[in-house]
Amino acid sequence: MDLQSLGKLAKEASYELAITGSEKKNAALEAIALALEANQDKIVSANKEDIQAGKEAGLTEALLDRLLLDETRLAGVVSDVRSVIKLDDPVGEEFDGKLLENGLKLSKRRVPIGVIGVIYEARPNVTIDIAVLSLKTGNACILRGGKETIRSNIVLVEVIQAALKSVGLPETSVQYIKSTDRALVGELLKMDDYVDMIIPRGNAGLQKFCKENSNIPVIVGGIGVCHLFADKSVDQEKALAIVANAKVQRPTVCNALETLLVHQDIAEEFLPKLHAHLAPMGVTLIAEEKAKAILGDKATLAEAGDFDREWLCLNLGVKVVADFHEAIMHIRTHSSGHSDGILTNDFTIANKFINVVNSAAVYINASTRFTDGSQFGLGAEVAVSTQKLHARGPMGLQELTTYKWIGIGENLIRP
């Protein structure tokens, strides 16, 4: 596969997208939504082939769940596409305007980034999310999904390209690297003549490889070792409901809860309640020594490294901490910087938690599952960034733009 040609075509498409108005971009998104509905059987059939191949390859149930794109999930994707249509287009927005003493009218204007390269694993709905948000913001994209969903992704991109053609936009606005040759990832990372930003969505190994080998700015994130700290003042019954939601609702995603820290003053009372509440849901508690002593055979003793793991299943790490300080030190040591929260009725402690926990999303008395583009009102997201530049947290429309300075004068010359 000639990636250089892909890059050149994407760059050319990005120039046209950059000057395409909101009405036409929204028409393209509606065409994509209609095409996804019209091609549902074809898409679901391709996904079933991917699922069957995954089963034959011995993939875990957690990973197979990530691969799944059935009728229900596809309907959710289509709904997300239409939600993005309703969002304001950030491109062209002018802000920080001012008139300088030298007579220059100066402002910033939001513009597309250009060409976005996204390398991702497993979830085929990511293909739609990235394409839609890129198009809405006037960006072209080059996609490289995992081999596990190759059939689903190829069909999805073909559907998208046909929809783009139907409204008069370049099919090459969204392109897919069909080869599963891993060497092509390294080649893509060197294409700084054509690609303006790389977003790897996958495991720590993929993200490390991209950071170390890319000539292009890389946005990392999506690894979620997420924590909740049950403080001594917590409403225990309400806390149980939040913990269950954060862990059980969808354990295979990056905003699922992986570790619960429990203040020692409530541990004897709270941990048995926790087990009674979660065990019927299939949750296995992985406990450090103090928690294990309280829970006995109702928990499995944690091993070295367990509190650094993104379980992506119904395992939940549990640790008893002496106080607020120990909870913070544990989070600083083991959190991936994705989403962490505190469950408490002491809002002095809650505000202190917000100030000292350095994660992309920090919660008071809420589930970590809220860290999501649609839940944040952003529509779908291309990624959840855990770094501080250029974006942080769910990356929606605004995070897929940059800005340029606009200076307007009346035949001004610099004094």
Swiss-Prot record:
Which domain of life does the UniProt lineage start with?
Bacteria
Listed pathway(s): Amino-acid biosynthesis; L-proline biosynthesis; L-glutamate 5-semialdehyde from L-glutamate: step 2/2
Question: Sorted alphabetically, which keywords does the UniProt record give?
Answer: Amino-acid biosynthesis, Cytoplasm, NADP, Oxidoreductase, Proline biosynthesis
Q: Which residues cross the membrane?
A: none
- Which reaction is recorded as catalysed by this protein? L-glutamate 5-semialdehyde + phosphate + NADP(+) = L-glutamyl 5-phosphate + NADPH + H(+)
- Chief localization class? cytoplasm
Matching Pfam families, A to Z? Aldedh
- Record-linked SUPFAM superfamilies: ALDH-like
GO CC annotation terms, alphabetical: cytoplasm
Q: What functional role does this protein have?
A: Catalyzes the NADPH-dependent reduction of L-glutamate 5-phosphate into L-glutamate 5-semialdehyde and phosphate. The product spontaneously undergoes cyclization to form 1-pyrroline-5-carboxylate.
Q: Which family does it belong to?
A: Belongs to the gamma-glutamyl phosphate reductase family.
Name of the protein this chain belongs to: Gamma-glutamyl phosphate reductase
UniProt source species: Psychromonas ingrahamii (strain DSM 17664 / CCUG 51855 / 37)
Q: What is the lineage of its organism?
A: Bacteria, Pseudomonadati, Pseudomonadota, Gammaproteobacteria, Alteromonadales
Task: State which gene encodes it.
Answer: proA
